[in-house]
Curated annotation (Swiss-Prot):
This protein's GO CC annotations: cytoplasm
Chief place of localization: cytoplasm
Cofactor(s) for this UniProt protein: Mg(2+)
CDD domains associated with the record: IMPase
The UniProt record lists the keyword Transmembrane: no
Keyword vocabulary terms for this entry: Chaperone, Cytoplasm, Hydrolase, Magnesium, Metal-binding, Ribosome biogenesis, RNA-binding, Transcription, Transcription antitermination, Transcription regulation
Residues that hold substrate according to the record: E67, L86, D87, G88, T89, R183, D212
Binding-site residues, Mg(2+): E67, D84, L86
Name of the protein: Nus factor SuhB
Length: 267
């Protein structure tokens, strides 16, 4: 196993255990609003501190991009850890048990290792570039689909980007006619992992941040998924718009986005 993946797993488990334990004293969870429909709790910050100190004790010179703390500069500019200490904060605040710790390591702009840990189910999704994806050490692969007939698609409503709501609803309506069902779970990291593990057949979302998807997208790709932006390119880390499925699934989802999306989201 890649030594950095080892540290990522250690950090994710430590943070995840802290998050799960904090639910036992729910009255001590303090929530503040960062922006429109965007929440942060003291537990997010505590989990992030646990992850950062675990990384720094092994790799003090690496850079870290963290959801709550922003960029933590390091001497080694080539390595970046991208962390989301609690992906699915709204679920966590509501006591809805679906959230995860997400950690990815990028080297010279390419994601090398990734792990996503769900402390409520004790499921650990991992990937290393070129070496496949695993769920609790067992190999996972995406099952190809021919089209959207019978497909279950994961997505999320653009609550933080309501200017795109009309466009999004048109896309959703077009897919609704074709696919079997939608899943809207509240964690982008787990949506991508669930795609990798065949629990859903495809995934699309707009307006994400790099830490929402950095780990999940490598896990999905290493499980055999194609991952693109809304224009069919690979600029999703910049645009924040992502589509993931097997090749024909991506083609079908992109077609609906192109036909129904406004020009502002076709990137």
């Amino acid at each position: 196993m890649h030594p950095m993946l080892n540290i990522a797993i250690r950090a994710a488990r430590k943070a995840g255990n802290h998050i799960a334990k904090s639910l036992e004293n729910a009255e001590k969870i303090q929530t503040t609003q960062k922006g429109s429909n965007d929440f942060v709790t003291n537990v997010d910050k505590e989990a992030e501190a646990i992850i950062v100190s675990t990384i720094k004790s092994s790799y003090p010179e690496h850079c870290i991009i963290a959801e709550e703390g922003g960029l933590i500069e390091g001497k080694d500019k080539e390595v970046q850890w991208i962390i989301d200490p609690l992906d699915g904060t709204t679920n966590f605040v509501k006591g809805f048990p679906h959230f995860a710790v997400s950690i990815a390591v990028r080297f010279r702009g390419k994601t090398e290792v990734a792990c996503v840990y769900d402390p409520m189910t004790n499921e650990l999704f991992t990937a290393q570039r070129g070496a496949g994806a695993q769920l609790n050490n067992a190999r996972i692969r995406v099952q190809p689909i021919k089209d959207l007939q019978g497909a279950v698609l994961a997505t999320a409503f653009p609550f933080k980007q309501k200017q795109h709501s009309e466009s999004f609803m048109k896309i959703l309506s077009a897919m609704f006619v074709e696919c079997a069902d939608f899943r809207r779970t509240g964690s982008a990291a787990l949506d991508l992992c669930y795609l990798a593990a065949n629990r859903v057949d495809g995934y699309f979302e707009l307006g994400l941040k790099p830490w929402d998807m950095a780990a999940g997208e490598l896990i999905a790709r290493e499980a055999g998924a194609i991952v693109t932006d809304f224009a069919g390119g690979t600029d999703y880390m910049q645009s924040g718009n992502i589509v993931a499925s097997s090749p024909r699934g991506v083609k079908a989802i992109l077609q609906h986005i192109r036909e129904n999306g406004n020009s502002a989201i076709l990137k």
